[in-house]
Amino acid sequence: MTETTVESLFGEKAGLVWEALDQNGPSTIGDIMKVTTLRREEVYGALGWLGRENKIAVEMRGRAKIFSLQS
């Protein structure tokens, strides 16, 4: 039986989101979901992980939150 760690649970998905932002630039949650095929809660978990590591920026454009990699 393999054990799931927090690092593997969120870290893997954070890597997918980071790659999506790196390749596609600033994106909405919906954009990230389409590119990565992750569920909404997985994207939010990954963004939280990346945010905790200070690797992303968030900007409001109208009512939309746009996520990008920290420059």
Region annotations inferred by a language model:
Residues 3-14, 28, 58-71:
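Short, cationic-aromatic polyanion-contact patches
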Residues 38-49:
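Short amphipathic alpha-helical interaction segments
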Residues 9-35:
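Short amphipathic alpha-helical interface segments
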Residues 32, 44, 61-62:
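Short loop/turn and capping residues at structural boundaries
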Residues 54:
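Glycine-centered, phosphate/nucleic-acid-interacting loop/turn motifs that mediate DNA/RNA or nucleotide
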Residues 22, 50, 68-71:
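Non-catalytic effector/regulatory segments
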Residues 18-21, 48-49, 57:
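N-terminal, helix-rich and Lys/Arg-enriched segments in bacterial and organellar proteins
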